[in-house]
Swiss-Prot record:
The lineage of its organism: Bacteria, Bacillati, Cyanobacteriota, Cyanophyceae, Synechococcales. This is Ribosomal RNA small subunit methyltransferase H. It is found in: Cytoplasm. The keyword Transcription regulation does not apply. GO terms for molecular function: rRNA (cytosine-N4-)-methyltransferase activity.
Length: 309
């Protein structure tokens, strides 16, 4: 199979069901003439809903080029004309309103009516062994959100970083109580090249009692490595600090998080930054029906804030 056909196959297989779509649309209130920013385009579900419910235009960002291509194909198949959509292969931490947004007749960047961020890893990324996000199937220790990026992979972290660096991220990003034991066991087991190798090493490192839980001992380690590789929390902090500059007065930011580290950052920023007015005192969670339909939705939390006038 040639490269073009392989890429097409990936796009056709890229199916990601967006979470809390109805709640996002309800809070962002798309209206005719409105412009919105989707900083985590993924499968295009949130953007499609906004465009179908009244939004005039959407700027979509994604670090993953496969997701970007799949979303573009999905939106085109839904009848969304190209002039209503502007897509960028971009980390949202690098977004610049003047460069990447819509412009007025004077060439100035136009602030958005609303922004949506659906954080974390998508189902297609988790389900593709070659991406290295999951230990359910053997794959390379990669974990880059953008597989084309020239950056450290999970294998680089596991095999080259000092053990103290591993302990640090396992504690900070994985909240792992056996971080030191696991890090030293990894150091003794180097080199490690695959997801299943790493999962086995973690399994051996933890006490027998810790192996009997519902959650595999490697789950937090994989989360910590993924966050470190992609600098996810740093990117989220940048988004929360910069988003008021990208919004019109009264414009809204909707953030969907999937673990407590993300949710705490969002909650703290919304409550302490005077530029935000909190619209969701408590996070919104998916209904039981949505959780049954989409297992990924179970840990999702939505917080929304408006830019102060």
């Amino acid at each position: 199979m040639d490269l073009a056909r392989a890429e097409l196959g990936e796009m056709l297989l890229y199916h990601h069901e967006s979470v809390l779509t109805e709640a996002v649309v309800a809070y962002l209130q798309p209206q005719q003439g409105g412009a919105f920013l989707d900083v985590t385009l993924g499968g295009g579900g949130h953007s499609l809903a906004l465009l179908q419910r009244g939004a005039d235009r959407v700027v979509g960002l994604d670090r993953d080029p496969t997701a970007l291509q799949a979303a573009q194909a999905r939106l085109a198949a839904a009848g969304i004309p190209g002039n209503r959509l502007q897509l960028w292969h971009l980390n949202f931490a690098d977004f610049d309103l003047q460069r990447h947004g819509f412009r007025d007749e004077r060439g100035q960047g136009i602030p958005f009516d609303g922004i949506v961020a659906d954080l974390g890893v998508s189902s297609p990324q988790l389900d593709c062994p070659e991406r290295g996000f999951s230990f359910r199937a053997e794959g390379p220790l990669d974990m880059r959100m953008d597989p084309t990026a020239d950056q450290e992979t999970a294998a680089d972290w596991v095999n080259r970083r000092p053990v103290e660096d591993l302990i640090d991220i396992f504690v900070r990003y994985g909240e792992e109580r056996f971080a030191r034991r696991i890090a030293h066991h990894i150091e003794r087991s180097r080199p490690l090249f695959t997801t299943t190798q790493l999962a086995h090493v973690v399994w051996q490192a933890v006490p027998p009692a810790a192996r009997r839980g519902r959650i595999h001992p490697a789950t937090r380690i994989f989360q910590a490595l993924r966050i470190a590789v992609n600098r996810e929390l740093e990117a989220l902090e940048t988004l929360l600090a910069q988003a008021p500059n990208w919004l019109k007065p009264g414009g809204r930011l909707a953030v969907i998080s999937f673990h407590s580290l993300e949710d705490r950052l969002v909650k703290w920023a919304f409550r302490t930054d005077p530029r935000w007015q909190v619209l969701t005192p408590k996070p919104l969670c998916p209904s039981e029906l949505e959780q049954q339909r989409n297992s990924r939705a179970r840990s999702a939390k939505l917080r929304v804030a408006a830019r102060s006038s």
